[in-house]
Amino acid sequence: MDVVSISSDGFIVALLKAELILTANIIAGLAVGELILVSGVVEYLFAPVAPRLALWGIHDKIASAMVIAIGAPRSGAAIISGAYSDGEITRREATYGTLSLAFPAYLRRWAGTVAMAVGIAGRTGLIFAFVLVIRSACRFIWVVIMLSKRGVKRVAGRASLKGRESIGARERISRVFLMLKRSLPMAWFFFALTYALVPFADRAFSKYLTNPALYKIIPAEGWAVAISSIAHVTAGLSSAAGAIGTGSIDIGQAVLALLVGNMAGSITRTMRQNVGYWVGIFPRDLVPNLLRWHLITTVTLEVLSIMLIWCASLVIPFG
């Protein structure tokens, strides 16, 4: 959305609607997470595999959050938030556990993504979609390896938790309301700030990508594809299909351009979609570390995937 091109009244209305959706997501996520924790479903489902998970250093709450994230990623994050607040997992486990939810959640969407990508851009879309899912899988493996450090100590640590007194319903409800009271104002402010600044950041990326010096890597038509994909993947795929159809770029250059645009847009998407929710459900001390490692793991693999596709385009005739 272009803030400059609409009236201030229209912007405020759109912002308020977005804030309401954010608030509903935060409240619903925390409520569902607490219900799952208090129901005992996690312990029942994961008791058979708990010893093996313990050897890998993965807490049963985190493992359950991974499964739940396939259908409801925000509920999975709320489970981790509740376990962290209960003292069942450490800050390190909460950080990497939350990051691990992205891949299970993406798998559910990926079937639709690949179908759409192939439908719009054919072989280009297929390659692009597979790069995205492979990159997401590599990130999942990375954070799970980080999560599984010191795994041998998890068995003793879990045993000591069994004798801990369970938290009552009243205390859980009180904790949720206290968390909402402390975190919602910050979430609202941060979301509003990001909502207002993201369009300017997108335009700054777009202006940078039109630098003629970059045409040595990708033709001008390819950068047009990259700029389109900053806004939305569908726009980028459509631009790629058009550019390939006119012979302006080949498939390798189109995939490279799509990945560059995807990387440029991922930073603003993180600020717009992830951080506001994290601020709403996690304690404040956890969010900076979570954001830092999210960017480190995401941007590192995005850069590596771009480099690999660029090298491949030099030696492999994509067509």
Model-derived segments and their meaning:
Residues 1-10, 47, 148-182:
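Intrinsically disordered, low-complexity non-transmembrane regions of multi-pass membrane transporters
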Residues 2-44:
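N-terminal signal-anchor module of multipass membrane proteins
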Residues 12-20, 122-131, 181, 247-248, ...:
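Interfacial loop-to-helix junctions that mark the boundaries of transmembrane helices
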Residues 31-54, 177-249:
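Transmembrane helical segments that form the transport core of multi-pass membrane transport proteins
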Residues 56, 62, 67-99, 113-126, ...:
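Membrane-interfacial helix-loop connectors
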Residues 88-147, 254-257, 276-308:
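Membrane-core helix-loop-helix motifs of multi-pass transport proteins
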